[in-house]
């Protein structure tokens, strides 16, 4: 069995498909991934969390909510706050990586996920920002990376 760190942008592009994402996550599960580290941010993270919670009805998997600080959702819209609260409540584990917000707490959360996972699944369309930095960090650590939108292929390391 293996573990996966999820990373992706808050903004979802027009061509983003939850159906495709669900198919890709199911492919990961069916090929041995049973633990997912999720940063619980607006956008890609919470969409993944919702899908994985649905998948738990059919597959034995574990969702670990990796929270950068206790007040992560305080500036979320009402819609995303509701999604966040539901997903965090249903997660198998909750890890809060910083006691309070600091300039580096998001990066610390992202590095925690990469350090604890066997590989990374990324929704990346920009070379800047937290997602790009997380992918670069994963590459530095020698972690395999799969990307949203690419067909499933076994890793060859």
Regions from the PLM with identified roles:
Residues 1-157:
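Acidic/glycine-enriched connector segments
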């Amino acid at each position: 069995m293996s573990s996966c760190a999820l990373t992706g942008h808050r903004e979802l592009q027009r061509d983003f498909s939850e159906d495709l994402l669900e198919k890709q996550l199911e492919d990961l599960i069916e090929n041995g991934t049973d633990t997912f580290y999720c940063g619980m941010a607006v956008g890609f993270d919470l969409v993944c969390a919702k899908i994985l919670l649905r998948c738990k009805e059919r597959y034995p998997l574990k969702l670990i909510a990796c929270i950068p600080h206790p007040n992560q959702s305080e500036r979320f819209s009402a819609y995303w706050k509701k999604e966040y609260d539901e997903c965090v409540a249903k997660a198998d584990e909750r890890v809060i990586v910083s006691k309070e917000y600091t300039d580096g707490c998001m990066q610390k959360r992202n590095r925690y996920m990469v350090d604890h996972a066997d590989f990374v699944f990324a929704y990346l369309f920009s070379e800047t920002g937290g997602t790009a930095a997380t992918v670069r960090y994963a590459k530095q650590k020698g972690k395999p990376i799969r990307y949203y939108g690419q067909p499933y292929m076994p890793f060859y390391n």
